[in-house]
């Protein structure tokens, strides 16, 4: 069920360019290149099909827009993402995020990122995140209990209700379901502003109070206020059940013992709110939507969860939910939270046999990798069995990157999978989902989100 893309890549190297020549220039007209760059979920596929798995764009004069290389092969992804963060810096999208939301693990440049990563890495190990999962199934059960038998529901809205509730109850010590608007609207406003400025070659100065800038700053202030309330409540109540907040308070850089300041903790909580709101909820919504179109797959998920009995699921049950995990991997393949990953080369580097100059903006097309017919059989089909152990054997680790890869991969991947697994198994054990929406429309203001309601009918399952 998995193909190996090395044959195509090596043939491309031999036929298209000598080793360490510059990547071939993309033949599409400038207008189509610009449109593809702004379409994170499908644009890299368009550029790959026209210019090959490593293709160079020129979107304007170098003094205005740096050269861009789009990479869509496993080898190219490895060559970019596995490098030391000293060689691969964050780019202007991350600079815009840092300016608006403050310095956090996602947007910090190398010098600030390294001590922060050292301090936070122990918090997010697979062992530790299991301590954060106590309320996930409980929240999912409560959401399902709200649905009348035969209810018509928007899977996107309900998935956000589950993930926000689980995030708040399990790790932040706060009922975020009562703060839905406090989180949802500011998050969407902030990420849209960041993505628009990051992708635009011509940007108004940050000091200019444009309407978009004012809205974005107000959104950032709202998120920081909420993060401050979460931190203050945890400090005021020693018994508050807020394991992530307590872990951030206790975090120390193992090399120098430095702890995080309250301002640094607030910035990390803001990015965690952003990631927890959009990314996991979209994965859960997509998985539910896909199961609503594949009755046999849905029945297998339900049978797996039912085999654990009628009790509430716990993090310890994830080991017995292997097929449910495979369903989520397939959802992440077809709808990755981050359709592209970007870096800036700080020195000349080799990318899949091509020489890329310092200062080049590098775009790794995750969606393009995940849907490449040279790498996957029937790439557009929803088939969780492709992630069974036998079918995963021999797969290039760099062709499936739902959480990125290398030293700057997503630090919260274990918690995201824990949350999505327990939520999906709990929901499907309790209801049958029948999807009414034929497609799952996606927009990518920054991460992938549903672009319209995802309607389905939820029928109760007899205990």
Locate the predicted segments by residue.
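Conserved cytochrome P450 K-helix E-x-x-R motif and the immediately C-terminal K′/meander segment
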Residues: 31-55, 225, 229, 311-352
């Amino acid at each position: 069920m998995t193909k190996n893309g090395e044959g195509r890549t090596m043939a491309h190297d031999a036929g298209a360019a000598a080793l360490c020549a510059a990547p071939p220039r993309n033949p599409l007209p400038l207008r189509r290149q610009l449109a593809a760059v702004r379409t994170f979920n499908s644009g890299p596929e368009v550029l790959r099909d026209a210019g090959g798995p490593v293709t160079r764009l020129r979107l304007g004069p170098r003094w205005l827009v740096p050269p861009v290389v789009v990479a869509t092969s496993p080898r190219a992804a490895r060559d970019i993402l596995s490098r030391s963060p000293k060689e691969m810096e964050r780019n202007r999208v991350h600079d815009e995020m840092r300016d608006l939301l403050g310095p956090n693990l996602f947007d910090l440049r190398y010098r600030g990122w390294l001590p922060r990563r050292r301090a936070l890495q122990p918090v997010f190990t697979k062992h530790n995140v299991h301590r954060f999962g106590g309320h996930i199934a409980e929240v999912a059960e409560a959401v399902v209990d709200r649905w009348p038998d035969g209810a018509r529901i928007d899977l996107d809205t309900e998935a956000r209700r589950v993930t926000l509730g689980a995030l708040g109850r399990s790790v932040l010590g706060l009922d975020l379901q009562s703060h839905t608007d406090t989180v949802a609207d500011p998050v969407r406003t902030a990420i849209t502003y960041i993505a628009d400025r990051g992708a635009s070659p011509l940007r108004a100065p940050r000091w200019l109070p444009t309407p978009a800038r004012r809205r974005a700053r107000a959104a950032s202030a709202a998120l920081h206020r909420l993060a401050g309330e979460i931190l203050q409540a945890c400090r005021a109540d020693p018994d508050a059940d807020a394991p992530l907040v307590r872990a951030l308070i206790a975090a120390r850089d193992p090399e120098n013992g430095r702890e995080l300041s309250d301002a640094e903790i607030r910035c990390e909580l803001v990015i965690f709110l952003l990631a927890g709101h959009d990314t996991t909820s979209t994965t859960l919504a997509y998985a539910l939507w896909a199961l609503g179109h594949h009755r046999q797959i849905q029945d297998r998920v339900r049978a797996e969860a039912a085999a654990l009995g009628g009790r509430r699921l716990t993090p310890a049950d994830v080991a017995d939910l292997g097929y449910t995990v495979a369903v989520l991997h397939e959802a992440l393949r077809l709808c990755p939270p981050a359709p592209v990953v970007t870096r800036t080369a700080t020195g000349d580097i080799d990318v899949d046999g091509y020489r890329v100059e310092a200062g080049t903006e590098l775009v790794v097309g995750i969606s393009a990798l995940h849907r490449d017919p040279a790498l996957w059989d029937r790439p557009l089909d929803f088939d969780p069995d492709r992630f069974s152990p036998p079918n995963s054997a021999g797969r290039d680790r760099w062709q499936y990157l739902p959480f990125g890869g290398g030293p700057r991969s997503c630090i919260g991947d274990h918690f995201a999978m824990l949350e999505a697994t327990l939520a999906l198994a709990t929901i499907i054990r309790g209801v049958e989902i029948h999807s009414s929406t034929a497609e799952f429309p996606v927009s990518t203001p920054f991460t992938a989100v549903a672009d319209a309601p995802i309607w389905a009918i939820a029928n109760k399952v007899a205990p």
